[in-house]
Amino acid sequence: PKNSMRGRNNNGHITSRNMSGGGHKKMYRLVDFYRKKFDVPGTVERIEYDPNRSCYIMLIKFDDGTHFYYLAPQKIKVGDVVENGSAKEIKVGNCMPLRDIPVGVNVHNVELQPGGGGKIARSAGTSVTISGLDGNYSLVKMTSGEVRKIDSRCMATIGVLSNPDQKNIKIGKAGRSRWLGRR
């Protein structure tokens, strides 16, 4: 678990005030935002809660025996097969370059530089829409309405992220905020 010092030094004295502290201990799950396992199909083994992020994560077992955690999109279920790489089927959970994704499809975990790992649309219920192609670039419409020009070799995952109702959760009391490590 990640150590939560929150403004205290090794003697326990406050060295930086106004930092939130405490909260329930969290085990960090290593989520793969790069999705570099190309052309090997993988099966969704389970979908899990992750205390470190707002959306759910899925454990994928690839045919060569390796396991990875990925962000779980909506409408994916245990037993579904997902693949990474170019010219694959346009199916929820598949990851491919922006140039291979048709216009109007919702995607998440979008890279900003080829091979840089997903940076855009990683929070619960979010996605961006492919709105067009411009030479070697893809036009991507963000949830804010902004249209960004991103290199077409950048990878993105098909689908909208899970847990869209996360924004409607009521904290209810001050103590629950403290459980979450917020002040």
Label for each model-derived stretch:
Residues 1-53, 78-183:
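Basic, glycine/proline-rich low-complexity segments that contact nucleic acids
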Residues 51-58, 67-70:
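Short, flexible active-site-proximal loops enriched in glycine and acidic residues
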Residues 65-77:
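Beta-strand/loop nucleic-acid-binding surfaces
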